[in-house]
Amino acid sequence: MTTAKLAVLPIKDLNPAEYNPRKKLKPGDKEYEKIKSSIVEFGFADPVVVNSDMTIIGGHQRVTVAASLGYTEVPCAIVDVDKTQEKALNIALNKITGEWNQELLADLIQDLQNSNFDVGTTGFEPPEIEQLFSKVHDKKIEEDDFDVEAELKKPTVAQMGDVWLLGKHRVICGDSILPETYNVLMEGKKANLVLTDPPYNVNVEETAGKIKNDNMADEDFYKFLFAAFVNMEQNMEADASIYIFHADTEGLNFRKAFVNAGFKLSGCCIWKKNALVLGRSPYQWQHEPCLFGWKKGGKHQWYSDRKQTTIWEYDRPKASKDHPTMKPIALMAYPIQNSSMMGCVVLDPFLGSGSTLMACEQTGRICYGVELDEKFVDVIVNRYIEMKGSADDVFVIRDGEKVPYAHLVRGGDGD
């Protein structure tokens, strides 16, 4: 950025920025009257910042008030920057005082993020940005009614080793305990959050069928979890958090593997369901625990307030028979919004029926998932397509070739 040049310019030659996110002031507004009193008392002592094309970057309100006082020209500091830098400078100059138009500000920051611009230079910290996006863009999380059972009866399309591209999301059909699975999936990226629901080792079987790796000897199950958790730890950012749903009956193995893999156990959250789940125990289960933590010796990001508790009350999915231990989308969206920002990568190494991916889609995050069972990869793919209403942004990378989903199905692959 070059040094600003000072000049006195006619107000009629200055162009207000159409994107300016500041709320427009009018006579009688407290801020308007403050600016007016200052100009009357001290004159126009603070130059307006304008770009070389005469677009006002900082000083819209002062120009408006000055014109109302009869000024025809004002002192200006002229800079020569591109439009992306101009927008960032607008935010930075206006951050200290005044009120924002929240929607315009959120759109402007999103525009900068989409241009890969470092929005930190605007003076807004990540938690402030996420809070802003939450106010403006967050909407009620919607559950779906995708028929998983019907999908499971169809011929399997997915194959081991496939990498599915579902819009901005990536799903690999592979084994979550193998490092090479993550090498292919992540492409060198690191996850900003891990949220997953591994097999519980309780030998669950419902109409959707058994979960793979759900009936192991105690020591084997620990080794399985440890291997998976180590891969998660190695593919997370230093400040990423991790959430692990599990069964209380296997709590010892989960906690032992969690800590030994390199995580700090901060606490255990509880999903309180609206109805019990019939089982063999004298006490019927109406909750599921979820480990919460982050890397040992590291830090973690938090984007919510201090009023959140360890009890999460969400109704079970009406079609929970679709996948054993299936989670509602709103439940998965809750920790996602607490521990990540829009545009962040959320890793789920046990994607199952895809609730994490559905929650990421609705909250503006990017899901990178692993699923071992080909038939449930099909469930994830078609659940996404049904939510989007189109398969236009769905592709599979198979044998080094990127194939549109429509071509794959039309070609009869898997029939």
PLM region spans:
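S-adenosyl-L-methionine
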Residues: 162-183, 381-415
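Core catalytic lobe of class I
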Residues: 3-377
